[in-house]
Structure formats: structure tokens, C-alpha cells
Amino acid sequence: MTDLKQFIKQEAVAIIAFIVAIISCIFVPVTNYVSYIDTDLIGVMFGFMAVVAGFSVNNVFKVLSEQVAALAKDTRNLALALVFMVFFMSMLITNDVALIAFIPFTVMMYEKIDKSPVYVIVLQTIAANMGSAFTPFGNPQNLYLFSASKMTSSEFFSLTLPVTAVSMLMLFIGCMMIKKEPIFLEKDEQKATVQNPKYLLLYAALFILCILSVFNVVDTISVFASVCVVV
């Protein structure tokens, strides 16, 4: 009984949402639910997730992180590099994936220089959300809105570009508030290397196909089938 109470307390929001969903079923015919499933959207999301997972498994993001961080010679430039790496990558690989891919590296880097990573991680979180808002495939919400609204590419980017520009400025200001201190990083003999580089061009081609399917240049079923065959 105690475990049940603890579960209800921890998952209160999920339980309430489930109950409300069940109640809503009374007012909507069951036959309508099938029409809610957007198979094209699910197919595109699967394609992006599978391809990004391929990049991740082959250490692409680790190598990118190390190369970007190596350019920084002080704490401020390190923050700029890490924050804007997440900002721009989230436009392509979605906000949550960008955070999962790069925050562990940020924590590791700040442990090496004996500094707290909290402020930079907060900026990275903001960067991931604001950067992902720029493209139709930056996050699932954008993907759905772009698909459902039938907007043209120019209409979509005319809405997101001003927000993205302001976000970049605010993130830059946030990074500039960090005190500039020199950092000295020992060369790591066990640098990350890209695994199976021969597959990277294939993954890149699939990623481009996924993007083209968002803009209805390529059929979603063809992309889904291609990803399934390769991955």
C-alpha cells in the first residue's frame, strides 16, 4: 500500500492525464482515433531518430565536441563554443538529442578545469530549445505544426528567423557575462575517433533524404524504407 501511495505521489501528473484521457473517450467515438495517427509524421521522426542514432553510435558527436572545445583558450570562449554548438546542432538533430549528446561532454570539460558547469548547462538548455525552433525538423512540435499548417518554407522561416536571431544575441550576451580566465587542458591520449567512417556518407545521405521528405520533395515511405534497409 505504501508503494502504491508513493507511486501515485511521484506520477500524479501522468495519472491525472490518463484519467482525463479515459474520460474524454466517452465523448469521442472510438472510430475517430485511427484518423488521429499521422503515419507520415511518425515515419519522418523514425528516420531522423535512426540516422542520428547512427551518428551517435559512431562517435560523430564526441569527435565534434572535442574539436570545437579544443579551439577555446579561455573560459568565456569555451562557453561560447559549447553553447553555440548545441544551438546550431539542435536545428538538425532536435533539442533533446543535442542536450543528451553534448551535456555529458560539457560536464567532463568543466571537471577538467575545476569549474562549475551549471551556468553553461543552463545556457545550453536554452540554446537547444531556441535553436531547434528555427527549423521544421528541430523538434517534434515544429514538425507537426509545419505539416498540419501546410505552410511554405518561406512562410515558416519568416516566422522563426526573428526569434532565432534574438535568441542568438541573448545567448551571446549570456556567454559574455562569464569571467574570462585562461584554461590549460592536457592533451588527451585517448581521443574519440569516428567509428566506421565508411558509413558516414550513407548516414549523411539518409539524413538529407529525411530533410527532403519534410519539405515533401521525397516520399516519406521511400525514406522510411531506405532507413530500415540501412539501419
Predicted features and spans:
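Juxtamembrane and boundary regions of transmembrane helices in multi-pass small-molecule transporters
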Residues: 2-4, 154-202
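Transmembrane helical segments that form the transport core of multi-pass membrane transport proteins
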Residues: 36, 65, 207-231
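Membrane-embedded alpha-helical segments and adjacent helix-loop junctions characteristic
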Residues: 33-116
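Membrane-interface alpha-helices at helix entry/exit sites of multi-pass transporters
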Residues: 76-81, 112-123, 151-162
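Generic alpha-helical transmembrane segments of integral inner-membrane proteins
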Residues: 19, 46, 84, 88, ...
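Alpha-helical transmembrane segments and, especially, the helix-loop junctions at the ends
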Residues: 90-100, 117-149, 171-175
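Membrane-interface helix termini and inter-helical loops of multi-pass transporters
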Residues: 28-37, 62-67, 142-155, 183-189
